[in-house]
Swiss-Prot record:
UniProt protein name: Minor capsid protein L2
Superkingdom of source: Viruses
Subunit structure: Interacts with major capsid protein L1. Interacts with E2; this interaction inhibits E2 transcriptional activity but not the DNA replication function E2. Interacts with host GADD45GIP1. Interacts with host HSPA8; this interaction is required for L2 nuclear translocation. Interacts with host importins KPNB2 and KPNB3. Forms a complex with importin alpha2-beta1 heterodimers via interaction with the importin alpha2 adapter. Interacts with host DYNLT1; this interaction is essential for virus intracellular transport during entry.
Modification after translation (UniProt): Highly phosphorylated.
Subcellular location: Virion; Host nucleus; Host early endosome; Host Golgi apparatus
GO cellular component entries: host cell; host cell endosome; host cell Golgi apparatus; host cell nucleus; viral capsid
Record carries keyword DNA-binding: yes
Cystine connections: 21-27
One MF annotation (Gene Ontology) recorded for this entry: DNA binding
Function: Minor protein of the capsid that localizes along the inner surface of the virion, within the central cavities beneath the L1 pentamers. Plays a role in capsid stabilization through interaction with the major capsid protein L1. Once the virion enters the host cell, L2 escorts the genomic DNA into the nucleus by promoting escape from the endosomal compartments and traffic through the host Golgi network.
UniProt record similarity statement: Belongs to the papillomaviridae L2 protein family.
UniProt source species: Human papillomavirus type 18
Keyword DNA-binding found: yes
């Protein structure tokens, strides 16, 4: 015997149960909290709303109206006010009968309205009467109506702004007025005033500066920072880098390219020098001094990677080659004498008292000086007597000549013929009757204490 289980019947809704069981007090325990909003979830929302403003979101235990502001439908828009314009007057519709004509005729009583001034009509056979007047006669227009003809009068006058006068004269004296548009006529008989010119240049001593004050220091132009972290430092030992830098990048022999300009290359995988791999550009050279050397530098650009858009990405390289050191040399160069060395017997003393006793000495008190001649081959000295110039009684100043020294000389003519006798020594003699000293020289401070002699009525013979 099979037992049949009774089918489960669905319970009524919470709202229907609450309406019937609330009054009798027989409601299930889960009905009243759901309807009255006293469940645990509703209490959590009530407690949290004390510190959190939920606004008009409609979250709570209310009646489900969306709070004070109500619900706003998603994607909706606010109400707009439509302006209604003035209404047109109704058009009277006239019915057309079957017997009425289909062609509407125009109104025959309507007149054409013409606008504009009427075209003047001239009546008469004599034509226009033209009257002329001078520059002083005012223009008079004949406005008297005439039934026979129309008279037109014209006035001729001379405008000096558009006509050149026959004789240009000096304008009259200018006047001072508050109006800036005050001018003087350019023709006619006018008076003029002669205004003398004034010299505005001030006199000076001639020592005024004629140029501006120069800068105290020389402003140095900032050069490229070759030794920064942005450049890779590569030393090139190949001397071809100075004259033919393209030979380090390409194998072919291109046409002549100047070495002092920027060189451009195509990226290659096989290059003669591995330091110049992926180089596409070499900038112009520069000479710098670095740590006591003269350095030849060039900046290069590598093209290591290419993006899809064609952008080249690569490092910047500083290639340099040290040419020569500029440090001072530790060696000392000994200077060589320009005059050949002589023996001891060829030397002489210019202050030696060696005079010829055969020559008479004048009785006047003078200072004696010896004169010698130097010769590298013949060790001999020739003395001359004192030369006394007749002087006045102002100061007793002797006049003498200095020694004549002949330096050794060589000749390229072969054979060399040595002189048999010393050449005649030329001396300087001063002849005169008197002389004078400029007294002002005694009071002017001088660096070297010497008195210049000025001889009058004399000459110098060599």
């Amino acid at each position: 015997m099979v037992s049949h289980r009774a089918a489960r019947r669905k319970r009524a809704s919470v709202t229907d149960l609450y309406k019937t069981c609330k009054q009798s007090g027989t409601c299930p325990p889960d009905v009243v909290p759901k309807v009255e909003g006293t469940t645990l979830a509703d209490k959590i929302l009530q407690w949290s709303s004390l510190g959190i403003f939920l606004g008009g979101l409609g979250i709570g235990t209310g009646s489900g109206t969306g709070g004070r502001t109500g619900y706003i439908p998603l994607g909706g828009r606010s109400n707009t006010v439509v302006d209604v314009g003035p209404t047109r007057p109704p058009v009277v519709i006239e019915p057309v009968g079957p017997t009425d004509p289909s062609i509407v005729t125009l109104i025959e009583d309507s007149s054409v309205v013409t606008s504009g001034a009427p075209r003047p009509t001239f009546t008469g056979t004599s034509g226009f009467d033209i009257t002329s007047a001078g520059t002083t006669t005012p223009a008079v227009l004949d406005i008297t109506p005439s039934s026979t003809s129309v008279s037109i009068s014209t006035t001729n006058f001379t405008n000096p702004a558009f006509s050149d006068p026959s004789i240009i004269e000096v304008p009259q004296t200018g006047e001072v007025a508050g109006n800036v548009f005050v001018g003087t006529p350019t023709s006619g008989t006018h008076g003029y005033e002669e205004i003398p010119l004034q010299t505005f240049a001030s006199s000076g001593t001639g020592e005024e500066p004629i140029s501006s004050t120069p800068l105290p220091t020389v402003r140095r132009v900032a050069g490229p920072r070759l030794y920064s972290r942005a450049y890779q430092q590569v030393s090139v030992a190949n001397p071809e880098f100075l004259t033919r830098p393209s030979s380090l990048i390409t194998y072919d022999n291109p046409a002549f390219e100047p070495v002092d300009t920027t060189l451009t290359f195509d990226p290659r995988s096989d290059v003669p020098d591995s330091d110049f791999m992926d180089i596409i550009r070499l900038h112009r050279p520069a000479l710098t001094s670095r740590r006591g050397t003269v350095r030849f530098s060039r900046l290069g650009q590598r093209a290591t990677m290419f993006t899809r858009s064609g952008t080249q990405i690569g490092a910047r390289v500083h290639f340099y080659h040290d040419i020569s050191p500029i440090a001072p040399s530790p060696e000392y160069i000994e200077l060589q004498p320009l005059v050949s060395a002589t023996e001891d017997n060829d030397l002489f003393d210019i202050y030696a008292d060696d005079m010829d006793p055969a020559v008479p000495v004048p009785s006047r008190s003078t200072t004696s000086f010896a004169f010698f001649k130097y010769s590298p081959t013949i060790s001999s000295a020739s003395s001359y007597s004192n030369v006394t110039v007749p002087l006045t009684s102002s100061w007793d100043v002797p006049v003498y000549t200095g020694p004549d020294i002949t330096l050794p000389s060589t000749t390229s003519v072969w054979p060399i013929v040595s002189p048999t006798a010393p050449a005649s020594t030329q001396y300087i003699g001063i002849h005169g009757t008197h002389y004078y000293l400029w007294p002002l020289y005694y009071f002017i401070p001088k660096k070297r204490k010497r008195v210049p002699y000025f001889f009058a009525d004399g000459f110098v013979a060599a």
